[in-house]
Amino acid sequence: MNTMKRMDCRDLNQSELTQHCAELGLPKFRGRQVFQWVQQKAVQNWEELRNIGAGDRQKLQEGLFLQPLRKVREQIAQDGTRKFLFRCADGETLECVLMDYDRRKNRDRHTVCVSTQIGCAVGCAFCATGLGGWRRNLSPGEILGQVLDITYLMRQEDPDFQVTNIVFMGMGEPLLNYEAVLKAIELLNDPEGQGIGMRRMTISTSGVAPKIRQLAKDNPQVGLAVSLHSAHNTTRDQLIPMNRKYPLEELMEACGDYTTLTNRRITFEIALISGQATLEAAQAVGHLLKGQLAHVNLIPVNPVAGTGMARPTAKEVQQFAQSLESMGIPVSVREEKGTDIDAACGQLRRQLECEQK
């Protein structure tokens, strides 16, 4: 009688799958085959593993489960951005977004913004995700499953579709689900899976200083983006409650340690809000980042019901950027995607929850 705990095959790397197959009485090479089917081809059920006999598939099904996320809703913006609401096995819902960037001379870039938690405990003032509180962490399989299931869906339209970039900027704080995020990165990077280069993945954090240091020591070759939003503790306390635990002084010290250990530039994100995108605010950011290995990404805020925040004018955005550039700070304004479908994280999930009340 098999008393092994049934595991999610999407959580397992090749070595773990090989070991698990051996424990199920299967040849070890089955581990590699299963990994390729699950992680590279993004299969949705065991019957799709065509080079594995029915008897072995039955053993796999008894010892492992393969349970894709179920699409609940999809919204498609005029610019082609797609927002997905998926349901997990326990009934919880999560969001992820597919953004296409046509680079013409190079290959097209297909970026997926993935969630790492159900809800979020950080409670940033301009974010819809935190309005419903934190429910639980996502497993590695649920994190990378967003990429796999989008890939599966898109290959119904284009058999050659391939995700090229990942940003951990969806629902949740990635560094508060640290081990699962790193495992998902490992699996997504495997050349026999999706084969996405680590330099094409970016983790965005609200400022969990100790985990920024740990990330520097563990040194996966991923990008780091820090949600800065203000150079004043009093303002940042209101925008990002995490700042009360890890204030700017501690955050910037951790960022300095990160760049020293990795020699990699950090992207500092500034959400621009009408009435707060002032020249004084820009100059304060410039002084804070002076001498840092840094790039600033300006993000005109998406209006979210329940936050009372509005977008700044184009002139405010331009003046903010020019002020930073005059201080020698590299700056860009985020290319807007999906504004007509509320593509900011948490909005579609919140809409569904409001409808069900």
Swiss-Prot record:
<keyword id="KW-0819">tRNA processing</keyword>
<feature type="domain" description="Radical SAM core">
    <location>
        <begin position="106"/>
        <end position="340"/>
    </location>
</feature>
<keyword id="KW-0949">S-adenosyl-L-methionine</keyword>
<dbReference type="GO" id="GO:0046872">
    <property type="term" value="F:metal ion binding"/>
</dbReference>
<dbReference type="GO" id="GO:0030488">
    <property type="term" value="P:tRNA methylation"/>
</dbReference>
<keyword id="KW-1015">Disulfide bond</keyword>
<feature type="active site" description="Proton acceptor">
    <location>
        <position position="95"/>
    </location>
</feature>
<keyword id="KW-0698">rRNA processing</keyword>
<keyword id="KW-0479">Metal-binding</keyword>
<dbReference type="GO" id="GO:0051539">
    <property type="term" value="F:4 iron, 4 sulfur cluster binding"/>
</dbReference>
<dbReference type="Pfam" id="PF21016">
    <property type="entry name" value="RlmN_N"/>
</dbReference>
<feature type="binding site">
    <location>
        <position position="127"/>
    </location>
    <ligand>
        <name>[4Fe-4S] cluster</name>
    </ligand>
</feature>
<dbReference type="GO" id="GO:0005737">
    <property type="term" value="C:cytoplasm"/>
</dbReference>
<feature type="binding site">
    <location>
        <position position="302"/>
    </location>
    <ligand>
        <name>S-adenosyl-L-methionine</name>
    </ligand>
</feature>
<keyword id="KW-0408">Iron</keyword>
<dbReference type="InterPro" id="IPR007197">
    <property type="entry name" value="rSAM"/>
</dbReference>
<dbReference type="GO" id="GO:0070475">
    <property type="term" value="P:rRNA base methylation"/>
</dbReference>
<dbReference type="InterPro" id="IPR027492">
    <property type="entry name" value="RNA_MTrfase_RlmN"/>
</dbReference>
<keyword id="KW-0489">Methyltransferase</keyword>
<feature type="binding site">
    <location>
        <begin position="172"/>
        <end position="173"/>
    </location>
    <ligand>
        <name>S-adenosyl-L-methionine</name>
    </ligand>
</feature>
<feature type="disulfide bond" description="(transient)">
    <location>
        <begin position="113"/>
        <end position="345"/>
    </location>
</feature>
<dbReference type="InterPro" id="IPR048641">
    <property type="entry name" value="RlmN_N"/>
</dbReference>
<dbReference type="InterPro" id="IPR004383">
    <property type="entry name" value="rRNA_lsu_MTrfase_RlmN/Cfr"/>
</dbReference>
<feature type="binding site">
    <location>
        <position position="120"/>
    </location>
    <ligand>
        <name>[4Fe-4S] cluster</name>
    </ligand>
</feature>
<dbReference type="InterPro" id="IPR040072">
    <property type="entry name" value="Methyltransferase_A"/>
</dbReference>
<dbReference type="Pfam" id="PF04055">
    <property type="entry name" value="Radical_SAM"/>
</dbReference>
<keyword id="KW-0963">Cytoplasm</keyword>
<feature type="binding site">
    <location>
        <begin position="227"/>
        <end position="229"/>
    </location>
    <ligand>
        <name>S-adenosyl-L-methionine</name>
    </ligand>
</feature>
<feature type="binding site">
    <location>
        <position position="124"/>
    </location>
    <ligand>
        <name>[4Fe-4S] cluster</name>
    </ligand>
</feature>
<comment type="function">
    <text>Specifically methylates position 2 of adenine 2503 in 23S rRNA and position 2 of adenine 37 in tRNAs.</text>
</comment>
<feature type="active site" description="S-methylcysteine intermediate">
    <location>
        <position position="345"/>
    </location>
</feature>
<dbReference type="GO" id="GO:0000049">
    <property type="term" value="F:tRNA binding"/>
</dbReference>
<comment type="similarity">
    <text>Belongs to the radical SAM superfamily. RlmN family.</text>
</comment>
<dbReference type="GO" id="GO:0070040">
    <property type="term" value="F:rRNA (adenine(2503)-C2-)-methyltransferase activity"/>
</dbReference>
<feature type="binding site">
    <location>
        <position position="204"/>
    </location>
    <ligand>
        <name>S-adenosyl-L-methionine</name>
    </ligand>
</feature>
<keyword id="KW-0411">Iron-sulfur</keyword>
<keyword id="KW-0808">Transferase</keyword>
<dbReference type="GO" id="GO:0019843">
    <property type="term" value="F:rRNA binding"/>
</dbReference>
<keyword id="KW-0004">4Fe-4S</keyword>
<dbReference type="InterPro" id="IPR013785">
    <property type="entry name" value="Aldolase_TIM"/>
</dbReference>
<dbReference type="GO" id="GO:0002935">
    <property type="term" value="F:tRNA (adenine(37)-C2)-methyltransferase activity"/>
</dbReference>
<protein>
    <recommendedName>
        <fullName>Probable dual-specificity RNA methyltransferase RlmN</fullName>
        <ecNumber>2.1.1.192</ecNumber>
    </recommendedName>
</protein>
